[in-house]
Structure formats: C-alpha cells, structure tokens
Design a protein with these regions (language model features):
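Glycine-rich phosphate-binding loop plus the immediately following alpha-helix
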Residues: 35-39, 51, 66, 71-102, ...
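Gly/Ser/Thr-rich active-site cleft segment
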Residues: 9-10, 15-85
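Glycine-rich phosphate-binding loops at beta-strand->alpha-helix junctions
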Residues: 221-240
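Short beta-strand segments
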Residues: 1, 50-53, 104-109, 117, ...
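Glycine-rich phosphate-binding/hydrolytic loop that grips phosphoryl groups
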Residues: 231-232, 238, 251-287
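Adenine-nucleotide phosphate-binding core of ATP-dependent small-molecule kinases
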Residues: 164-218
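Short, small-residue-biased leader/transition segments that mark boundaries at the very start
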Residues: 2-7
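Short acidic, glycine/serine/threonine-rich loops at helix termini
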Residues: 8-9, 60-65, 115-119, 127-128, ...
Length: 287
C-alpha cells in the first residue's frame, strides 16, 4: 500500500514511489501495481505518470489516530478513490460541492470501508484491511482481541498468515465458503437460513459502523452513500438502509467510478486546476 501522506489528490510517479512499491515498504496490496504499470507505459510513450487518491489517503483528524494502546496508531486505509469520486457526484446532484458537504460513504465490495467526509476531507475511516468495523465477504472486521491472540498463538501463525487470514479468508468466506453475494442470495432464496443469518449479520455490523461515522460528523450529514459492487444487491441495500434512514437520506451509487476518477484527477492537473504533488517531498508517516 502507498505510504500515509497528509496530502491528497494526484501525485507524479517518481523513483522513490516505485522503489517503495516494489519493496512493499508499507504493505502488500494489488493496488501497489498501479503506479508500476503506469510507469511502464509512461516510459514507452515519453509522458508523465500519475496516481490519484490512493487507498491510503490520510486526512484523519488528530483524535482519529488514537488506537487505545501507546505505540500503535490507527491507519487511514479505505477505498478513497471511489469514495471521493462518488461523494463529488452526489454533492453535484444535491447542488453543492464536495467541499461544502458532509457525507458518510460506505464502499461495499470484497472489502468494506467507510469514510466520514467533512467539507472535502476524509476525517475518519473504518479501516477494513487492518481489522476494523464490519466483517465483509472475505475480511474479518473487528475481532475479540484476547480470543484472537490466543488463537494465533495456538495455531503458531506468522504475521503474513494473519494478514492473509483477516483480509482474505474471513467474513462470509469463513462462515459460508462463498464470497459472491449473488450465490449467497440464491442460497437464501432456496431457504438456506445459515446464509441468511450471516448476510444479515454483515449488514447489521455495517449499520453499526455508519452510526460510528455519524458521531464523527456530529449528526450534520447531507447523505449516507452506499457504493461498490455489493450496492447492486437490493437485499444488502435494504438491510442496511432500514437501520440508518433516521440518520440521513440514503443515496445508492452501485459499482465504482474509479476509472473516471483517475481520468478526472489527472485532467485537473493537465488543465491547471490542480498541481500534481511530489511524492518524494510528501510528509510520510512510517508504519
């Protein structure tokens, strides 16, 4: 994953960035390949390469960094590119700008992340990659710490195995052996009560995390936005919405705007609306 920077928007790909990604300096994630692949094309065609709103955009307010244990800090990890793109779109639909709006954005995919977007900044997140918040189709979300620590010791797991477990082999996959919501909903339609139970449990936990983000925004919320691939599921949308409609209006934007967001971010640089940031000069927070 990209390092945690206090700046956001678009970065020019440089050698320091490529080195950090190739050596997995901060973490292992498929998105690490983005800048590396972009650089291959950039060198071939003699043009600059950029990244836009990487998954570790860090705009956290100071209190949001506190974990509860000295020496461990909360990290800002979420689907920032899609969250911010969809938030801009919904703000436009409401006749406002992103910088004038307050949103809770819920990205529903194999991983689930939530962001509290306050006047153009993602001031707090529910970081599903590191084991916060709801369980997802393939991630654990928050776990009982003592029981999990005991289980790690008993199974003699390495840190690499733990990461793969909580971010790839947990959630619905561990309960049902399935991550595809279409298949799970077909099982439910056929009368599978176990599948129904765990899908509802996931939606219950997502709704709880939405409530958490509502507190961050002190109840001043223009909309709760549900996006990502799982937002195509009417079952998931309804299960979540019925629990949180009292907080703010629900806006559903299924799928992702990530390709359009990449274009729009770089276009803002090329037209002079924004200036590309220099990764090597950015403030980096170490692990």
């Amino acid at each position: 994953l990209f390092p945690y920077t206090t700046l956001f928007r678009s970065y020019l790909v440089d050698q320091q960035m490529l080195e950090d990604l190739r050596t997995e300096r901060f973490n292992t994630h498929a998105s690490n390949l983005g800048a590396i692949l972009a650089n291959e094309f950039a060198e071939k065609y003699h043009v600059p390469a950029f990244i836009v709103d990487p998954v570790v955009v860090d705009e956290l307010q100071p209190l949001a960094r506190i974990s509860g244990l000295k020496g461990i800090h909360r990290r800002s990890v979420g689907h920032a590119l899609n969250q911010k793109a969809v938030a801009r779109k919904i703000a436009e639909d409401l006749g406002k700008t992103y910088e004038q709006s307050n949103f809770i954005v819920v990205h529903l995919g194999g991983g689930i992340s939530l962001g509290a977007h306050q006047k153009g900044r993602m001031v707090d997140v529910v970081n599903g990659l590191d084991g916060e918040g709801p369980y997802t189709p393939e991630r654990s979300g928050a776990l009982p710490l003592v029981e999990f620590a005991q289980w790690i010791l008993e199974q003699e797991l390495t840190i690499s195995q733990v990461k793969k477990l909580i971010a790839g082999n947990s959630g619905l996959k561990s309960y049902l052996g399935e991550t595809d919501l279409r298949h799970i909903q077909a099982q439910i339609a056929a009368g599978d009560q176990t599948a129904n139970y765990y899908l509802k449990g996931m939606c219950y936990q997502i709704a709880k995390s939405i409530g958490e983000m509502a507190v961050v925004l002190e109840g001043t919320i223009d909309a709760i936005i549900l996006t990502g691939g799982a937002a195509y599921s009417q079952t998931v949308v309804q299960e979540i919405s019925q629990k949180v409609t009292w907080i703010a209006p629900i806006k559903v934007y299924p799928g992702e705007m990530e390709m359009a967001a990449l274009y729009e971010g770089v276009n803002r640089v090329l037209t002079g609306e924004e200036q590309a940031l220099n990764y090597s000069e950015a403030k980096i927070e170490q692990e």
